[in-house]
């Protein structure tokens, strides 16, 4: 019993350093919000302007890697000896469910406004050209390219899971073929894991920072409760308590049911917006946007704007590529886990087609609705953002639909469930990554999960206190830098090991 307790306890070398680092950064930020904003702006400017090109080349190189997997020597290799664990339909549905987070609802509803009001390529703000390119840029940033990079890492983790039979809970476990067991399990591996965990903590905190205002703004619209930072903090605290109760009472089945409800409700809400907003316009706009995407794709891939220095690629392309980089390991581990028994080609094609369809549907329906509301002067988004913030503007794009009360109730429930499952996933992932050993069928310790959910909640509150999107963008970009190198090392380790051990 003593030995079992030791194995399932925390791993100090990857538990305390991220806890201390993140705690100190939060304390310094709260101590002087104005000074923190100055530092945030400086970090954002440095990383995006000096290293933005690296993120763009990373995505392009990983895209070539995807083609190598699909048409190369490993295309027909099977990831495990068992038949696929899930049917193809269930598999794609699970991938769709992973896309319908509250943060996705946040960006899907408002992103197009920023592209139209501050467009790329020197276009005039709010011009016809800017509107024609608006959705096309969303399709680029949330389309096949990033999902192709995820599929490469998913193949890598699935290979380590099901072919090499490795128990991977931290990225250092995959680096043995690249740097050797001594370094992978020593100081180097510990540093890699700590980079991963610190970045992941901030990424999850930013997702919570995006999701919470949507729920509190819904509460203001539905119940007349004023939206304040204190209300945001109360809501986050309630989610943490609810998560703790679910874990303590063994209600994980309930959380899984909530995830299914979230997916079905997402389909229902998107279908409603599609029908009442203007199905014909949405399909025409999508078709035109695909053409614009194909026409501008080379420029989008390598757009850094070094001459005009308008800031668009730094604020959006580099930000989103960092977003994809920072979530790559966590998402790839999940996608690998549900892909047992599939071939490399199946996984790569299934991910790119299934997940691209999911994100394109979300962005097309929500973005088109927002554009229609802007064109018809039904809502004044710049005024709403200036007076009340971005979350209120998003809420008004939903409230402007027919049967507004029923629509808002649906959106409120969707955001609430999405954030409950987000907090649960955050605490589970971080607890798994900071424990010595958690075997199949076991849960990480309750107190560890609660502790991480509290810390993620604190980060969300701190980012909300700073105000605006820049702190959230900076947290993602700064966290994406170390993960950029970690992802490359995992990729190289897979390639090296597969060449030696994955032969006919």
From Swiss-Prot:
Record's keyword terms, sorted: Antiport, Cell inner membrane, Cell membrane, Membrane, Transmembrane, Transmembrane helix, Transport
UniProt GO BP: 4-(trimethylammonio)butanoate transport; carnitine metabolic process
GO molecular function: (R)-carnitine:4-(trimethylammonio)butanoate antiporter activity
Pathway in which the depicted protein is active: Amine and polyamine metabolism; carnitine metabolism
InterPro entries (alphabetical): BCCT_CS, BCCT_transptr, BCCT_transptr_CaiT
Subcellular location: Cell inner membrane
Membrane-topology descriptor: Multi-pass membrane protein
Protein name (database record): L-carnitine/gamma-butyrobetaine antiporter
Organism: Escherichia coli O157:H7
